[in-house]
């Protein structure tokens, strides 16, 4: 994500008006994995979480370059990815089908990455009481 999108990313991760819907999950993620931080790397923005190595950040960006969503995940055990943080631009909640499409696209990309990663067969959604979804074939 370009550095000039820092404010949009801060709004999405830290000041999202919809955070109250998943407050318990956010607290659980922070207690377990650490606080997310935005940092610059190789001329772009990334999110790191606590002192965990291998945290990956996935951005959903519109055709005109507007940040629509973010997913932060890590390989938490040999066989699973943990989705630590997931956020969508709150303005999209006025258009539920677009909001859902962005969330589904982010999860689809994480699932695709998991399928390409040897040994990973589950995706854990930390916001949903650590619910793990098994990947099939």
Predicted regions and their residues:
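Contiguous hydrophobic segments
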Residues: 2-18, 56, 117-137
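Short linear motifs in intrinsically disordered
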Residues: 4, 46-50, 112-114
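A signal for specific C-terminal beta-sheet/loop modules enriched in small/flexible residues
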Residues: 4-11, 58-63, 73, 82-86, ...
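Acyl-donor binding region in acyl/amide transferases
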Residues: 76-136
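Serine/threonine-rich low-complexity intrinsically disordered regions
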Residues: 2-4, 18, 48, 62, ...
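Short amphipathic alpha-helix that is part of the acyltransferase structural core
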Residues: 1-42
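A conserved beta-strand-loop-helix scaffold within acyl/acetyltransferase catalytic domains
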Residues: 27-32, 36-80
């Amino acid at each position: 994500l370009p550095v000039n999108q820092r404010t949009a990313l801060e709004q999405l991760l830290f000041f999202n008006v919809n955070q109250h819907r998943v407050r318990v999950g956010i607290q659980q993620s922070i207690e377990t994995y650490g606080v997310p931080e935005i940092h610059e790397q190789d001329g772009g923005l990334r999110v790191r979480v606590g002192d965990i190595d291998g945290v990956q950040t996935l951005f959903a960006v519109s055709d005109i370059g507007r940040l629509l969503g973010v997913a932060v995940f890590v390989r938490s055990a040999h066989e699973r990815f943990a989705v630590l943080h997931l956020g969508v631009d709150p303005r999209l909640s006025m258009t539920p089908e677009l909001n859902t499409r962005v969330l589904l696209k982010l999860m689809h990309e994480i699932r695709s990455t998991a399928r390409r990663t040897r040994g990973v067969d589950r995706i854990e959604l930390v916001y949903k009481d650590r619910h793990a979804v098994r990947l099939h074939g």
